[in-house]
Amino acid sequence: LTSVFGGAAEPPRGGNPDSNTLISDTTTVICLDDYHSLDRGVTALDPRANDFDLMYEQVKKPDFDAYIDPQKLDELIYVESHLSNLSTK
């Protein structure tokens, strides 16, 4: 990403130093984990498996209070039972 958008690659600030995600002062990475709309049957890389509309709405006009209080974000949350191999949205 930094080769496309510029800036010097560096590990995430305040994040996991072992992460392979590189950012710079001009580049950031948006994690799509909270936007997965499907839990089984397709890979998370399949566009059908993500709620890009929700991501777009939250990214285009950020509510900075939501970054301070994550409870204000509309997240898709899955509760998964590894024992029964069932999941609920």
Swiss-Prot record:
Belongs to the phosphoribulokinase family. This is Phosphoribulokinase, chloroplastic. Light regulated via thioredoxin by reversible oxidation/reduction of sulfhydryl/disulfide groups. It is found in: Plastid, Chloroplast. InterPro entries: PRK/URK. One of its GO terms (molecular function) is ATP binding. The keyword rRNA-binding does not apply. Pathway: Carbohydrate biosynthesis; Calvin cycle. It comes from the Eukaryota. Residues 1-22 are annotated as: Disordered. The lineage of its organism: Eukaryota, Viridiplantae, Streptophyta, Embryophyta, Tracheophyta. GO terms for biological process: reductive pentose-phosphate cycle. It catalyses: D-ribulose 5-phosphate + ATP = D-ribulose 1,5-bisphosphate + ADP + H(+). Its EC number is 2.7.1.19. Keywords: ATP-binding, Calvin cycle, Chloroplast, Disulfide bond, Kinase, Nucleotide-binding, Photosynthesis, Plastid, Transferase. Its main location: plastid.
